[in-house]
From Swiss-Prot:
Species classification: Bacteria, Pseudomonadati, Pseudomonadota, Betaproteobacteria, Burkholderiales
Disordered: annotated segments: 347-368
Gene symbol of the encoding locus: hemH
GO biological process: heme biosynthetic process
Entry-linked Pfam families: Ferrochelatase
Gene3D superfamilies hit by this protein: 3.40.50.1400
EC number, UniProt record: 4.98.1.1
Recorded metabolic or biological pathway in which this protein acts: Porphyrin-containing compound metabolism; protoheme biosynthesis; protoheme from protoporphyrin-IX: step 1/1
Family: Belongs to the ferrochelatase family.
Cytoplasm as UniProt keyword: yes
Gene Ontology terms for molecular function: ferrochelatase activity; metal ion binding
Subcellular location: Cytoplasm
UniProt name for this protein: Ferrochelatase
Presence of keyword Metal-binding: yes
Length: 368
């Protein structure tokens, strides 16, 4: 086992705390080559595709990447903004706003963001945090509902990174927040704001990203957490069971995934005479390809072409103030016990003690 070279140890330094907001990732550009690189990394993760590696290698490299990369690039191009990928833009802004809000609340922490796939790569961000002297790191996945296909993959990447480090920092992980009051309230405010302007629909469809059905039978709690989020949001909105429903989108491959599927369900609703539907994607905290293209464009077409009259997509929480405050509340809960809020008098004392420690180390022969 070989380890990476560590930065020089600095005696008397004050340990720093960091929060890493981690999202799924995105291609660097809406081009076939960039999308191919991204898909290769994403679909090579055994957490994402549970097929024997040898078999999957041939499927991925001989079928999926040659044909799907170009198709996906066109879809990315349809939602790409002047700032870049919407998912990356929103995640970066969320991290900056969370950093500022925690600072206003007195926390001395550094908030950064990383992507599980693509850039900024999680290992690169972790190396920079080490160089910055961060010895306590809290990981905040951008996924409210836990899944082995998403959240656990972040944990895997973090653990893998630190197997090659000698000096490992204190690590904490937020597993999920699907039923956190602040998250549910932020969703309610988002929906209610839309309804205050446009009125209520005949049906509110809550569309979550799908996963293979077998993951449910094998013990993944994702399905249950999605339904709990939906139930709590419906309660906040005072909806009856007939006024909302849960669906699952983004099916990939031929295997059975969690049902009902979003697109066929919308078509069915239109044919049954449901004139207006509003669709929200509570599992996505930043708008991205799956919301802006798959739902706002494709799902709209499916519903309207089947006879629907009015389709509204309610955007993700993105930089909504209620969501930033919710993120802060969730983060603060998991920062308990770490000295991120230090009174000025105590901070001065800590600096004095650090100076004494540093001078004593130098007296004994330390370089730094």
């Amino acid at each position: 086992m070989s380890f990476r070279t560590e930065p020089p140890y600095i005696h008397g330094s004050t340990p720093k705390t960091a929060v890493v907001l981690v999202n799924l990732g995105t291609p660097d550009a809406p081009t076939t080559s960039a999308v191919r690189r991204y898909l290769k990394q994403f679909l090579s993760d055994p957490r994402v595709v549970e097929i024997p590696r040898a078999i999957w290698w041939f499927i991925l490299h001989l079928v999926i990447l040659p044909f799907r990369s170009g198709q996906s690039a066109k879809k990315y191009a349809s939602i790409w903004s002047n700032e870049g990928s919407p998912l990356k833009v929103h995640t970066e802004k969320q991290a900056k706003l969370l950093n500022g809000y925690l600072g206003e609340r007195g926390h001395k922490v550094k908030v950064v963001y990383a992507m599980r796939y693509g850039q900024p790569a999680l290992p690169d961000v972790l190396r920079q945090l080490k160089a910055d002297g961060c010895e306590r790191i809290l990981f905040l996945p951008a996924y409210p509902q836990y899944s082995g296909t998403t959240t656990a993959s972040i944990f895997d990447a973090v653990f893998s990174h630190y197997t090659q480090e000698r000096n490992v920092p204190e690590l904490r992980f937020i597993k999920h927040y699907h039923d956190h009051d602040a998250y549910i309230r932020a969703l309610r405010k988002s929906v209610q704001a839309h309804w205050d302007m446009a009125g209520r629909p005949d049906k509110l469809v809550m569309s979550f990203h799908g996963v293979p059905k077998r993951t449910l039978t094998l013990g993944d709690p994702y399905h249950c957490e999605c339904h709990k989020t939906a139930r709590l949001l419906a309660k906040e909105l005072e909806l009856t069971q007939e006024q909302y429903m849960v669906t699952f989108q983004s099916r990939f491959g031929k295997a059975e995934w969690l049902q009902p599927y979003t697109a066929p369900t919308l078509q069915k609703l239109a044919k049954e005479g449901i004139g207006r539907v509003d669709v929200i994607c509570p599992g996505f905290t930043s708008d991205c390809l799956e919301t802006l293209e798959e739902i706002a464009m494709e799902a709209r077409h499916d519903f309207m072409s089947a006879g629907g009259k009015d389709f509204n997509y309610i955007g993700c929480l993105n930089e909504d103030d209620a969501w930033i405050k919710a993120m802060a509340e969730i983060t603060e809960l998991h920062l308990i016990g770490w000295p991120t809020i230090v009174p000025p008098s105590l901070r001065e004392e800590q600096e004095q003690q650090a100076h004494i420690s540093r001078e004593e180390a130098r007296r004994l022969g330390a370089d730094q």
